[in-house]
Amino acid sequence: MNKIFSLVVLCLMTGTLMAQQPTANQAPHASVTPLTSKDLPDFPGKEVLMITVEYPPGSSDPIHRHNAHAFVYVLEGSIIMQVKGGTEVTLTPGQTFYEGPGDVHVVGRNASSTKPAKFVVFLLKDKGAPVVTPVPE
């Protein structure tokens, strides 16, 4: 029974990993790691979520929104960010970027095709709301 269970788990994991692999025409996907979340008693219905995002070389995000206040702090590498109606900016370690709840994030990518980039994001959002909402192009 344990062998069958192990085989099923292995097959599921392999399928999941294969589904996440970019094709030859796609940029590699970003890796998002939740660090912590905290309810804010002084702000009923709100929570703070802190995540790290790692962009492999050449990685980029699809157009999206957060429906949250998002505060970005670059840890390593260089990233390019832009919200709809805003100016495209290149950020390096120690620099910050802000997205408001109504902003549509039209550019988010690693500035390098050879080096990874990593940043931390603090999101002030409605409790239980999704972190990212896709926006049709």
Where are these regions (language model features)?
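Histidine-centered metal-chelating micro-motifs
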Residues: S60-P62, I80, F97, P101-N110, ...
